[in-house]
């Protein structure tokens, strides 16, 4: 394993900052990030890799200056959000493309990672700003939703889709995480 040298910061978030490092994108977690969260995220991203979806592949997990980091392939290109801003006349077509990509994501079955339904249940149960009647209503509605192990991105949008110069489309997993509370 080579020591990673961080280059230009390409993204900044509440719990992670992302840097370029040669042909890698390095997601550096804030100092208080538990090791378990970092390794679970790397595990989840690896499970998504196994589906065959175009996602940046994980190359390593390591400590950098006392902070945990996940290094993946650096995908050079523009986000679909940037392209849509540059070509507003083509937005309808890009939205159709997003729907197809979303359907492709949802067609993948993944086992061994936390289920969105379980995460939502925990979130609802932890809310102290709603009364027990509203909590019961929300949990009942959640229980009525289908049970399956299909993949869900968690924050799917044009800013999380990268299109390379040769029109290859990659799904950015920077926002994949086990709990909506952990969203960056």
Question: What are these regions, as identified by a protein language model?
Answer:
Residues 81-114:
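Conserved kinase catalytic-core helix
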Residues 175-184:
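Single conserved hydrophobic/aromatic residue that forms the stacking wall/gate
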